[in-house]
Regions:
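Charge-rich, low-aromatic oligomerization/scaffolding segments with amphipathic character
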Residues: 78-97
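Short acidic amphipathic segments
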Residues: 50-69
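Conserved hydrophobic positions within beta-strands
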Residues: 121-124, 184
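Short glycine-/aliphatic-rich beta-strand segments at the starts of folded cytosolic domains
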Residues: 9-40
Length: 409
């Protein structure tokens, strides 16, 4: 087993520069495109690295290696998940280099954990067998981050699965890690019912175990749900995202609309607003399939009882009493029920709406030269736009904020 390479990343638009702690070429650089051979036994480091990068991210179309700098170009702008994936490929270049073999024994598994994992699973509250509230404690303290932001969790592909599905792994992928981004959640209150402090040594996540489908085999959660308190995993040290309370004024009305575990970042922001003693009204609406899919109802009940400006509303779509009369979040807006629950009109001049969950609920439009083009299925974005609201777009901050948050891919 070779040593991990230390890597620093600098993404700039569609190009990212990765600086390594050792030279990978001589004085002459090497430029490579995806048409290099799929397999290359005995390939030199630049060719092997490029092949692995192309396998890991089909949007990468050019790799240039010169000494200790790797320049990688994508057909789309680099995001945090893509940067972490490429960094992982480069860091592991000399792990099993040239062998094409997977780890096979307990000692190798443990060595991979030592080299790749940087955090401990410190708390699990299993709301049901497929829905966890869990906390992760990093080995080193993390910098403060904003409520609503997200980071990455990962486990190695060498870890066992909780189901019988077979991973469709690429060559050399068995010693790499399955990664997924998760918004940070919050239980909001402690055991005595007091608001939690803004920063804690551990980080909370709200996670559903994703089951294999006909076309998609989830990689992370089937492994995660075999873990227990004290087990090790990887957690990204960078927390990012624009789904935050930026621009919210103390007297603004705040409406949180989410589906399923999309409730996670809403919880973190609600706790922050209450810590700030926010004066405006706060409404939190969560839509799930069954009432048993709600893991934070007790905490919200305490907040509703304590804070007169806070309201928590849940709707379910598959419980027996709703058969034949399903109600979705969009229906609450159409009927004006959401304004009754808020206790105030949806006034775009003094209201912020936060959307997290099923993309069909959000209904994010495409921005074209002719204007906004909304999906065929009516989503909340279109409903609010027609009421005079402005949807976040790139660096332009509006009063409709969104985080598309769907099942594992």
């Amino acid at each position: 087993m070779g040593q991990l390479i230390q890597v620093e990343a600098s993404p700039m638009g569609q190009v990212a520069l990765f600086s390594t702690d050792r030279s990978l070429t001589g004085q002459d650089g090497v430029s490579l495109t995806p048409d290099i051979p799929e397999t290359s036994d005995g390939a030199d480091p630049p060719h092997e690295l490029a092949r692995r990068l192309f396998d890991a991210d089909r949007l990468i179309d050019h790799v240039h290696v010169l000494s200790n700098t790797v320049s990688v170009r994508r057909r789309q702008t680099w995001d945090d998940e893509a940067v972490e994936r490429a960094r992982d490929v480069i860091a592991n270049l000399f792990v099993y280099y040239g062998t094409g073999s997977a780890p096979t024994d307990a000692d190798e598994f443990e060595q991979l954990r030592v080299e790749n994992y940087n955090a401990t699973l410190s708390h699990i509250r299993a709301h049901n067998e497929d829905l966890w509230v869990m906390r992760v404690t990093p080995d080193e303290p993390i910098d403060p981050f904003l409520p609503g932001q997200y980071t990455t969790l990962a486990l190695g592909y060498w870890e066992p699965r909780a189901d019988e599905a077979r991973d469709n792994l690429k060559p050399d992928q068995d010693h790499k890690m399955a990664r997924r981004s998760y918004s940070v959640s919050s239980s909001m209150i402690d055991e005595s019912g007091q608001l939690l402090p803004p920063h804690s040594p551990d980080v909370e996540f709200y996670i559903v175990k994703v089951k294999p489908g006909e076309e998609e085999i989830p990689a992370l959660t089937p492994r995660l749900f075999l873990k227990g308190v004290g087990d090790r995993l990887y957690m990204g040290r960078k927390f990012t995202g624009h789904y935050t309370l930026e621009g919210v004024k103390p007297d603004d009305s705040i409406v949180f609309l989410s589906t399923g575990t999309g409730e996670a970042p809403q919880n973190a922001m609600i706790a922050e607003l209450l810590r700030r003693e926010h004066r405006g009204r706060i409404l939190d609406v969560v839509c799930v399939r069954y009432r048993s899919d709600l893991a934070y109802t007790e905490q919200h009940a305490v907040l509703v009882d304590r804070y007169p400006t806070y309201r928590y509303v849940t709707i379910t779509t598959r419980d027996p009493e709703n058969e034949g009369k399903k109600v979705y979040i969009q229906d609450l807006i159409t009927s004006s029920q959401i304004e009754k629950d808020l206790g105030a009109p949806l006034d775009p001049h003094r209201t912020h709406v936060f959307l997290c969950g099923n993309p069909s609920m959000i209904g994010l439009p495409k921005w074209t030269e002719e204007g906004l083009v909304f999906p065929e299925t009516l989503g909340v974005c279109q409903q609010l736009y027609e009421k005079g609201f402005t949807i976040d777009h790139r660096k332009d901050r509006g009063n409709v904020h969104y985080e598309e948050y769907w099942t594992e891919r």
